[in-house]
């Protein structure tokens, strides 16, 4: 029963979030995925665009519930039952009261599982980016992917787990339209592979001098 209620809430919020997005029908959505670096990338893109365009960014919202809430301009306070009731009541009202305009929506798209609603397919049912950034894939949030790998050898298991995670994240890139743009980290072999499958135009970045954007120096903070 608890699971059914949870799914109802997600579908409910998604319904109103998609209606809300239609108010900005000319908005270009930029999706960002990867096991690490999503927030930094979001901040960098936001800094570049904000002085010339109206930009909305999904701060602290990259999940199956967080993205819908962010689109509706709603935030959870303490995730109590009363808090959920509050956002459920406010969601339809936002269609009448929330008219924020933006040219770009930068959204982090984090996945924890190959299964809905915590997978990329569900996030893509909320937003359909025209531009996407795929940063990397590693074992962060890998628990739900364990069932996909039968190998017990630690090295083989790790490699296959990372590939399974990358495959799920890559759905963002594969969903792009022909007039879409994919920005791929060619330093990550699993990310680089997706360039052969996407319909969109690919721009590469990385340390190799053959990349469209070569990174020659970086600083870790």
Question: Where do the language-model regions lie?
Answer:
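N-terminal pre-Walker A segment at the start of P-loop NTPase domains
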Residues: 1-16
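Walker A (P-loop) phosphate-binding motif
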Residues: 14-65, 77, 154-155
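Acidic, Mg2+-coordinating active-site environments of NTP-dependent enzymes
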Residues: 25-27, 101-102, 106, 124-221
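Short, well-ordered alpha-helices that flank and scaffold nucleotide-derived cofactor binding pockets
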Residues: 46-51, 69-72, 125, 196
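Conserved NTP-binding/hydrolysis module of P-loop NTPases
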Residues: 70-80
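Conserved alpha-helical scaffold flanking the Walker A/P-loop in AAA+ ATPase domains
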Residues: 88-98
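Switch II (G3) loop of P-loop NTPases
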Residues: 103-117
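Conserved ATPase-coupling elements of RecA-like P-loop NTPase cores
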Residues: 114-120, 143-146
